[in-house]
Amino acid sequence: MNYLPPFENNFWTYLLIGACVFALIQLVYVFNFYLRLAYRRKSNDPQVSSFPPVSVIIAARNESDNLYENLPTILSQDYPEYEVIVVNNQSIDDSNWILTAFAQQFTQLKVVEISKSPHLKPGKKLPITLGIKAAKYEHLLLTDADCLPNSNQWIKQMMQQIKASQQLVIGYSPFIQTKGFLNKLIRFDNTWLSASAFAYALANFPFKANGRNLAYTRTLFQKVNGFKSHYAISPGDDDLLLQDAIKYSAVATGLSP
């Protein structure tokens, strides 16, 4: 009969206990963060009888096709008072012609032109800053030219989330479903990342925002000095701004794209 030393004899017991502890930690993690989404109350407050005026800001560069397809839906929102500011960032396509035509049809559309220059930094930070300067309202809602709201209630659903203590709202922005495995993979990754962002935000640990659907106030933008702390970095008009903003405001979530 072979003799097993005490440690080797108990190895599998220790391993099983370790696996159970690890599984328990994972369950606590899931319950503490991700289940917050399942029990999040949808904000459809019947007492909201009036909505603040809103400036929708879109930074666009060579987006003529997307502007032609998506801008009419944004300009036809069911919202009492809002303007749409498109910052045409050095475009060399037909964007100027399309925006001019839409501006004649929709009085709430304002166009800001940025002339082409080799000295301008890439990215959306300058266009967004110029759009905010041109905006006449306190509440700002940002999206991209290649994004299409799923209904004419988009602005209302985002503005329902803003409160005095929550001056920034991170919104959901799913990818459109098309054929192919790659699209499935992209949509899964985006959904998982969005769920993580919302779950952590609901737990008061926000770490990610998406510039395709993001709202905040002009006051908050000015408090963090805009993009000054990270202007040298091309990306970050959403995530890095969020990290500055949470020093001054709590974060709300808007799950309706």
Protein language model regions, located:
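Short, well-formed alpha-helical segments that are part of the catalytic scaffolds
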Residues: 39-42, 63-76
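Cell-envelope/extracellular polymer assembly enzymes that use nucleotide-activated donors
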Residues: 52-55, 83
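Catalytic donor-sugar/metal-binding loop of nucleotide-sugar-dependent glycosyltransferases
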Residues: 219, 239-256
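Short beta-strand-to-loop acidic/aromatic patch adjacent to the donor-nucleotide binding site
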Residues: 137-148
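Acidic donor-binding segment of Leloir-type glycosyltransferases
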Residues: 71-118
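N-terminal membrane-anchoring/stem segments of glycan-assembly enzymes
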Residues: 1-49, 184-187
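Donor nucleotide-sugar recognition loop
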Residues: 222, 226-241
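Long helical/loop segments within the catalytic core of UDP-sugar-dependent glycosyltransferases
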Residues: 33, 110-127, 131-133, 157-224, ...
